[in-house]
């Protein structure tokens, strides 16, 4: 595999691969969920879509929302973690997987607006379109999707019931987002990186060639310390505080939703301290939370102890069940 793409490709698929290793599965009596695709937002000629997986019947059911990762630059709603989908099948939950407009053609404020609009659509249309019980919603996501999951707890109204963030981050303006990274492989030339983006607004990278090229763009941003500026359009050093409203760690209040976080201590893509910083602020505000730490695990829990990885994944599913049964 081309090393210029490898890191971001791993960012997008590591969660799915990690969750594929669990022994849980469908039973003989589990009926498959019914999949439909919906446009939840239109901006000009760009349609932003969501895939809905729902159980048969008209009874209102709780909702699990999945937000994909990919550095806010690549990824797709089609990247669905098997284990979470299996949970929804067994428990007869509605499962909702979101696309959103990708950077750098749009910036983080627009991406955040897509997340808000997705939940507005879910509350307004979900009950009649797919029998969603919008009083019970758990939001889940990995890496950049974990960031947007955390952000949803601060910007979505009404607030979700609970959140599950896999190796996410609570800030987008910290030094780690603006520093040159030594962990992203062979240097990607600027001209090559820029040639991969800027042609049109995308809501997913289902085209493998497109995803690969944009992966190179992400690697270039991390190698040069330009990632935060590239995806937000705001220079955090020149305009300190301007990104605060889009940094979940700076928006926690006592009514922030309960959250479970999973993170490896050797994560070289999203530092482990991103989750410990969140945990500290959550504790300060008295918010219920759990941080499951995987010693020695890389991004996506690569190199983590298989038993501990399985235990963490199982606890995440249990947390989802607990939260959706609580109301």
Where are these regions (language model features)?
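Short beta-strand/loop motif that positions the catalytic acidic residue
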Residues: 261-263, 267
């Amino acid at each position: 595999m081309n090393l210029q793409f490898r890191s971001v490709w791993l960012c997008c698929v590591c969660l799915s691969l990690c969750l594929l290793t669990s022994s849980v599965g469908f039973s003989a009596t589990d009926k498959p969920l019914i999949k439909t695709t919906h446009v939840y937002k239109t901006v000009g000629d760009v349609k932003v879509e969501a895939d809905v997986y729902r159980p048969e019947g008209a009874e209102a059911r709780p909702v699990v929302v999945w937000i994909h990762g990919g550095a806010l630059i690549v990824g797709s709603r089609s990247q669905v973690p098997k284990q979470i989908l299996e949970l929804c099948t067994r428990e007869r939950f509605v499962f909702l997987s979101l696309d959103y407009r990708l950077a750098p053609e749009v910036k983080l404020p627009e991406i955040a607006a897509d997340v808000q609009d997705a939940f507005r659509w879910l509350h307004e249309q979900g009950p009649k379109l797919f029998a969603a019980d919008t009083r019970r919603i758990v939001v889940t996501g990995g890496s950049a999707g974990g960031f947007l999951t955390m952000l949803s707890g601060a910007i979505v109204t009404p607030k979700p019931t609970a959140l599950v963030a896999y190796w996410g981050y609570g800030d987008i303006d910290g030094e780690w987002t603006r520093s040159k990274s030594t962990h992203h492989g062979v240097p990607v030339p600027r001209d090559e990186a820029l040639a991969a983006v800027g042609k049109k607004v995308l809501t997913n990278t289902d085209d493998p060639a497109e995803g690969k090229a944009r992966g190179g763009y992400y690697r270039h941003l991390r190698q040069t310390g330009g990632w935060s500026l590239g995806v937000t359009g705001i220079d955090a050093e020149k305009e300190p505080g301007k990104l605060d409203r889009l940094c979940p760690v700076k928006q926690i209040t006592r009514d922030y939703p309960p959250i479970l976080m999973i993170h490896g201590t050797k994560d070289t893509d999203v530092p482990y301290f991103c989750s410990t910083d969140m945990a500290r602020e959550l504790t300060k505000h008295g918010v219920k939370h759990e941080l499951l730490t995987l010693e020695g695990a890389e991004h996506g829990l690569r190199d983590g102890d298989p038993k501990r990885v399985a235990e963490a994944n199982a606890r995440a599913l249990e947390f989802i069940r607990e939260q959706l049964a609580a109301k």
